[in-house]
């Protein structure tokens, strides 16, 4: 099951063996990713040999299955609901009251458990078996009863209450100051932590929320360019489809009788001449062709006669016009005789496509492996630019530890040390719309330092997309 982190989880478990609830109300799902001790903390040798090396052992304690608050909470809720229906002055009601009733019950049970544990500490001489008292206290907490008593302990012993207690890790001040963990506790699961030894253990992680992989919104059919879900298989398929589209334009080259054929020639293409006037239509062919007079001389068309009048009767201008017309006919493209194929656009009508930036493929830059999946367009990102990114961060085993796929994009100033060095190297040279995979070695990422979800000396892999350059 995939989960998404939503908030930071932190818990302090002091030494001494006291049971600490993982969460106060057990109404949230969380994941523990790190356990650590403070090396500067003074060790607590109470009951321990001072000659031994200071250390702390973390244990997780789970209540037996079947002992939960759901049944009692439902009964309590029905009682509260019936009271509210009889009270006309109460304005509020509905599902939220059930949660309030359960939280109040759990807080009262926690307080009773603490009081029971305090009584056990004061009465250590009379009862040396403190673990059994803790079991009774937990039973009261889970079932929502009063403080643990001797008679209750007998009842619990008869019922055979057994706690699942497991060792998680042992930390010391010399070699093992911290330990990466991956423990996920589901909602409503009753879990406790306790520490035996000389140091307090600090637990960190995230509250998480399950992700339903089968959920599809109504607006998913609409394409959103800012949404980013880079899957290597889908990207490679998209590149293949783009390559097929490019090849389709070459199929026109196989026509037997094209209307326009290219001629290899060193002649320069004719220059376009601006014409004045609103009437841009070409004159009919019969008007352009001068008819021969009876004496063998060519007669001027009406259009040519008008031009002759504008030139004050200068006949030399007509001759120059004829020579210019003959020069236009010597074009770089020749028309075929068979025009049955219909009109086709000439090469001059095609608009030049916007140039892409970079080249596809894998390359290595300053120790960072870069695999361009899609080339962007426009200027390339350089040091000093502020860039807006979408990204998915993974470990080598494919486990996702961070992502920005929707909402506000991640922005930073390139080359200024605002991100890990591998990002400054890997994002440089991208253009808007470009997508690439960046493989960053540990020394250009977080090195030996371990972070939540990222063990020390980890190689990081990022699938990134550049949305904007400022």
From Swiss-Prot:
Residue stretches making up the PPIase FKBP-type domain:
384-470
Q: Which reaction does it catalyse?
A: [protein]-peptidylproline (omega=180) = [protein]-peptidylproline (omega=0)
In this chain, composition skew of type Basic and acidic residues spans 268-291, 319-332
EC annotation from Swiss-Prot or TrEMBL: 5.2.1.8
Q: Where is the composition biased (Acidic residues)?
A: 68-91, 115-131, 150-163, 218-254
Report the domain of life of the source organism. Eukaryota
Xref: Gene3D superfamilies: 3.10.50.40, Nucleoplasmin core domain
Chain positions covered by the region annotation Disordered: 40-101, 114-163, 210-358
Entry keyword Nucleotidyltransferase: no
GO molecular function terms attached to this record: peptidyl-prolyl cis-trans isomerase activity
How's its activity regulated? Inhibited by both FK506 and rapamycin.
Q: Which InterPro entries match?
A: NPL (IPR041232), PPIase_dom_sf (IPR046357), PPIase_FKBP_dom (IPR001179), PPIase_Fpr3/Fpr4-like (IPR023566)
> Which keywords label this protein?
Chaperone, Isomerase, Nucleus, Rotamase
User: What are its GO cellular component terms?
Assistant: chromatin; nucleolus
Q: Which family does it belong to?
A: Belongs to the FKBP-type PPIase family. FKBP3/4 subfamily.
Quote the subunit structure annotation: Binds to histones H3 and H4.
Functionally, this protein is described as follows: PPIase that acts as a histone chaperone. Histone proline isomerase that increases the rate of cis-trans isomerization at prolines on the histone H3 N-terminal tail. Proline isomerization influences H3 methylation thereby regulating gene expression.
What is the designated name of this protein?
Answer: FK506-binding protein 4
Species for this entry: Aspergillus oryzae (strain ATCC 42149 / RIB 40)
Q: Which gene encodes it?
A: fpr4
């Amino acid at each position: 099951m995939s989960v998404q982190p939503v908030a930071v989880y932190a818990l302090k478990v002091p030494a001494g063996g006291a049971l600490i609830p993982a969460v106060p109300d057990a109404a949230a799902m969380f994941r523990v990713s790190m356990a650590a001790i403070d090396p500067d903390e003074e060790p607590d040798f109470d009951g321990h040999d001072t000659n031994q090396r200071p250390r702390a052992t973390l244990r997780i304690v789970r209540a037996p299955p079947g002992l939960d608050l759901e049944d009692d909470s439902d009964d309590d809720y029905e009682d509260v609901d019936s009271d509210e229906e009889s009270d006309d002055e109460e304005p509020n009601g509905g599902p939220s009251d059930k949660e309030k009733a359960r939280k109040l019950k759990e807080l009262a049970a926690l307080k009773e458990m603490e009081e029971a544990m305090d009584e056990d500490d004061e009465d250590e001489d009379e009862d040396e078996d403190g673990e059994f008292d803790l079991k009774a206290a937990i039973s009261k907490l889970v079932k929502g009863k009063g403080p643990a008593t001797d008679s209750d302990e007998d009842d619990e012993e008869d019922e055979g209450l057994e706690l699942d207690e497991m060792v998680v890790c042992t930390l010391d001040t010399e070699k093992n100051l911290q330990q990466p963990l991956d423990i996920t506790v589901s909602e409503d699961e009753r879990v406790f932590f306790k520490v035996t030894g000389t140091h307090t253990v600090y637990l960190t992680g995230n509250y998480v929320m399950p992700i339903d992989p089968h959920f599809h919104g109504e607006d998913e059919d609409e394409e959103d360019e800012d949404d980013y879900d880079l899957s290597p298989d889908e990207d490679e398929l998209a590149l293949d489809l783009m390559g097929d589209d490019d090849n389709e334009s070459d199929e026109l080259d196989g026509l037997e009788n094209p209307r326009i054929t290219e001629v290899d020639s060193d002649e320069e293409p004719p220059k376009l001449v601006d014409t004045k006037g609103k009437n841009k239509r070409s004159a009919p062919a019969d008007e352009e062709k001068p008819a021969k007079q009876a004496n063998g001389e060519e007669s001027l068309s009406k259009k040519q006669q008008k031009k002759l009048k504008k030139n004050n009767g200068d006949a030399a201008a007509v001759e120059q016009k004829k020579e210019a017309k003959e020069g236009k006919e010597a074009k770089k493209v020749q028309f075929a005789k068979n025009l049955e194929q219909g009109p086709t656009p000439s090469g001059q009508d095609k608009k030049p496509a916007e140039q892409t930036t970079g080249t596809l493929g894998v390359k290595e830059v300053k120790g960072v492996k870069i695999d361009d999946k899609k080339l962007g367009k426009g200027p390339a990102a350089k040091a000093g630019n502020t860039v807006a990114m979408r990204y998915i961060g993974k470990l080598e085993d494919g486990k996702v530890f961070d992502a920005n796929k929707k909402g506000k994009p991640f922005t930073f100033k390139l080359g200024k040390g605002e991100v890990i060095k591998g990002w400054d190297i890997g994002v440089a040279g991208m253009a808007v719309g470009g997508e690439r995979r960046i493989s960053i070695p540990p020394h250009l990422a977080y090195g030996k330092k371990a972070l939540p979800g990222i063990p020390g000396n980890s190689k990081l892999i990022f699938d990134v997309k550049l949305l904007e350059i400022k």
